[in-house]
C-alpha cells in the first residue's frame, strides 16, 4: 500500500506492485502505451494524478528486465550508470545510494518507459531505434539549440511501405511533431551497424541506453 498526495491536499491510498511480469500480464503493455498505467483519480476532487514509482517490468519474451526510474531520480541514476557517486550539496554526507541490479535496464521517466515498451512490442531493436533517432535529429539543423525529445510511437503501414512514427517534442511550444521514418532507414542502420561502432558505444552510459547520451558527449 502506498499513498499519493493530490494538489488539493487530499492524501489517499493506492495499491501498486513494484515488480510486474509482462509475460503474465500482457494487458500492461497496452496500458503503458495508452498512458493509463500509474494514473490515479483523486477521490476528493476527481483530478487525474500521474505517479512515477520505481517499478521493474519482467518481460522474458523480450529477454529484458526494465526498471522504471522516476524522473526525479534521473541524475542519481545517470551518476550510478557512469560509475560516479553523488553527494548532497548541502552536506558532506552521501545521498542514499541508487541501486541498479546487473540484470536491469533503466528507463528514466514514464515517456521513456512507453517508448521502450512500444519498441519491444513491435519487435524492434532498441539500440537501432536510438541510433535512428540520433541520425534524424542530427540531420535537422533547423532545430538549432532547441531542447527536443524524440520518442518512438508505433509502426504504420503494410510490409514494404511501413514507417516508424517518431514523436518529437520541443520544436514548438505545446506541439508535437510527427516524423515518419521509412523502415529501410532502420534496416540500413542495422545493416551498417559495424561501421558505426563508436556511435553505438556512445549510445550507452553504463546500462542506460539513449540517443541523448551521444549529444551529451558532443
From Swiss-Prot:
InterPro entries: CpXC_dom. Pfam families: CpXC. This is Uncharacterized protein TP_0599.
